[in-house]
Amino acid sequence: MKTFTAKPETVKRDWFVVDAAGQTLGRLATEIASRLRGKHKPEYTPHVDTGDYIVVINAEQVRVTGAKTTDKMYYSHSGFPGGIKSINFEKLIAKAPERVIETAVKGMLPKNPLGRDMYRKLKVYAGAAHPHTAQQPQELKI
């Protein structure tokens, strides 16, 4: 019996919507990253993108435990000397709530072209509204 490997053209991708309200950031991000990779499917193949599309709503209501609200820092660099910027979780969730979930999930995906393709299937929105109703996403309980 030959080992099964999924072909990129035969992979069936579903759409799921996840409500982040009241969810813990890390636990939510690990489940999303796993589903973006396709590890929940029996036809999972490491070198093929077998994952589903994930739409995350209510990103502004995600929570963290402990003192991470004030202590967790996010860093970015402009590329120029001395161009490092830092912002804590509390300020970032007020400024750009989508970036908190996007950053957490992106860090859990492979750092290669396949990982970038997986990351493109993640859609994050601050509020409850999203423009993907035409895809008829199924609700995913995490």
UniProtKB/Swiss-Prot annotation:
<comment type="similarity">
    <text>Belongs to the universal ribosomal protein uL13 family.</text>
</comment>
<dbReference type="InterPro" id="IPR005822">
    <property type="entry name" value="Ribosomal_uL13"/>
</dbReference>
<dbReference type="GO" id="GO:0003729">
    <property type="term" value="F:mRNA binding"/>
</dbReference>
<dbReference type="GO" id="GO:0022625">
    <property type="term" value="C:cytosolic large ribosomal subunit"/>
</dbReference>
<keyword id="KW-0687">Ribonucleoprotein</keyword>
<dbReference type="Pfam" id="PF00572">
    <property type="entry name" value="Ribosomal_L13"/>
</dbReference>
<comment type="function">
    <text>This protein is one of the early assembly proteins of the 50S ribosomal subunit, although it is not seen to bind rRNA by itself. It is important during the early stages of 50S assembly.</text>
</comment>
<dbReference type="InterPro" id="IPR005823">
    <property type="entry name" value="Ribosomal_uL13_bac-type"/>
</dbReference>
<dbReference type="GO" id="GO:0006412">
    <property type="term" value="P:translation"/>
</dbReference>
<dbReference type="GO" id="GO:0017148">
    <property type="term" value="P:negative regulation of translation"/>
</dbReference>
<dbReference type="InterPro" id="IPR023563">
    <property type="entry name" value="Ribosomal_uL13_CS"/>
</dbReference>
<dbReference type="GO" id="GO:0003735">
    <property type="term" value="F:structural constituent of ribosome"/>
</dbReference>
<keyword id="KW-0689">Ribosomal protein</keyword>
<comment type="subunit">
    <text>Part of the 50S ribosomal subunit.</text>
</comment>
<protein>
    <recommendedName>
        <fullName>Large ribosomal subunit protein uL13</fullName>
    </recommendedName>
</protein>
<dbReference type="InterPro" id="IPR036899">
    <property type="entry name" value="Ribosomal_uL13_sf"/>
</dbReference>
